[in-house]
Amino acid sequence: MEKIVLLGYMGCGKSTIAQNLSKITQIPFLDLDICIEKRANLSIKEIFEQHGEIYFRKLEHEMFLELLQSSENAIIGLGGGTPCYANNHLLLQRDDIVSVYLKASIDTLYNRLVHNKSKRPLIANMDEEEMKEFIAKHLFDRSFYYNHAQHKVAVDNRTIDETVQDILDILA
């Protein structure tokens, strides 16, 4: 059983990198948020609106545990906040998984997120300064949890293929 867990801030490339890694390794990619949506039969936005964040974080933790305990191989892409709640950061250090923090700078994240702000409700109405401040605060708050990953891969000034290769080197 092989579990590869990718984590990092929104815009760091978790989904794109996981999809490419999946094609190369033939290990299925499971996006935690999509798994939660299928289970709840609601979008993440609807879960937050109808049940609140505490309920969502409980569902998220349960689904993460379920994916880790599955006998299937998987590349699991976490939501940006997943490691920060319900002691999920401790699960990143289990012996039976490989956890990788895709580390990006504030400028890299800003440049990636600014073009599709409308798809990200948290930042949709922010100007450049507000957005950079928001990202910086979140990165500061979350770095403790993100840094529990067994491996860190810098994504600044790296192509998707280069980042995937960095992860393949870790897995070798």
Curated annotation (Swiss-Prot):
Keywords: Amino-acid biosynthesis, Aromatic amino acid biosynthesis, ATP-binding, Cytoplasm, Kinase, Magnesium, Metal-binding, Nucleotide-binding, Transferase. One of its GO terms (biological process) is chorismate biosynthetic process. ATP binds at G11, C12, G13, K14, S15, T16, R120, R158. Substrate binds at D33, R57, G80, R142. It is found in: Cytoplasm. Its cofactor is Mg(2+). Binds 1 Mg(2+) ion per subunit. Pathway: Metabolic intermediate biosynthesis; chorismate biosynthesis; chorismate from D-erythrose 4-phosphate and phosphoenolpyruvate: step 5/7. The keyword Cell membrane does not apply. The keyword Lipoprotein does not apply. GO terms for cellular component: cytosol. It is an enzyme of class 2 (transferase). Monomer. Catalyzes the specific phosphorylation of the 3-hydroxyl group of shikimic acid using ATP as a cosubstrate. Belongs to the shikimate kinase family. This is Shikimate kinase. It comes from Flavobacterium johnsoniae (strain ATCC 17061 / DSM 2064 / JCM 8514 / BCRC 14874 / CCUG 350202 / NBRC 14942 / NCIMB 11054 / UW101).
